[in-house]
Amino acid sequence: MHGDDVDRTAFVPRRLPAEAAYVDSQVDLAANRQPHCVTCFERLLVQEKDENRRRLWASGKACATSEESCAGGPTLAPGHSGP
């Protein structure tokens, strides 16, 4: 594959300001519920390309299963808030 063919924005969710604020508030709620959740939440939110699954993560409903989803997977460094 040629470098020119790579879509560098493929893994970056495009959010409207209102949606970004909503997602941020859900990240805060998730942090209060389950401190381990935010790292996986942010990592998967950025990587998730499917809109419906991304919205499920944004709602925090998938947070309860993040331990299984993220166990052993790479995580963001402590204090890293994502892009």
Curated annotation (Swiss-Prot):
- Give the top-rank taxon of the lineage listed in the UniProt record for this protein: Bacteria
Region (Disordered) location: 61-83
Which key words tag this protein in UniProt?
Crown gall tumor, Plasmid, Virulence
Name this protein carries in UniProt: VirE locus 9 kDa virulence protein
Q: Which organism is it from?
A: Agrobacterium fabrum (strain C58 / ATCC 33970)
Its taxonomic path starts at: Bacteria, Pseudomonadati, Pseudomonadota, Alphaproteobacteria, Hyphomicrobiales
Q: Which gene encodes it?
A: virE3
